[in-house]
Amino acid sequence: MTVTETLAQAVERHHPRLVMLCSFQKEESVLVDELVRIAPDARIVTIDTGVLFPETLETWRAFEERFGIRVAVEDATGPWTGPENCCSAAKVAALERALAGADAWITGIRREQGATRANAEPVEFDERRGIWKFNPLVDWTEQDLWRRIHERDLPYHPLHDRGYASIGCAPCTLPGSGREGRWAGTEKTECGLHVA
């Protein structure tokens, strides 16, 4: 299935009880552009930890302006006490609130992002949450993303131009390829949003 077909299926089967999670990375540049063409009123949600990069906030504004959307916010702010507490207590709890009442959610995960995502399918049942999970970009490469971003002149996160392949919270993210810049110096590669 193409990205458009996967999103159309998600919208046809689950809208308006469908949520797209948005972290304003290159994957979401493509997904938001495609999704609003199919369902301009789709619910797009971000998780604000209170320690996002200033560039993330700028990209957020650029998305809203370019795509004519209002991104809903789930607040995950609180005292930053390190990646384990922040990720599990704050981000995962915020995602659960964002998905309350939803039948399905859309993510930007791609197989080439790492071992924990290598077996992802375009459409899968999220056993942990009891809802469907759509991963329209699962087969896309980094090159595919950049080709689309440049073809359509889409807004994208400026930290990608400075060597950040994956962008999360400022205290836990360094430049690096794949997900190696996330929680650098630890074995952690996922915050818990996409892990059962």
Q: Residue locations for each model-derived region?
A:
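Nucleotide-activated chemistry modules centered on ATP-dependent adenylation/adenylyltransferase
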Residues: 1-196
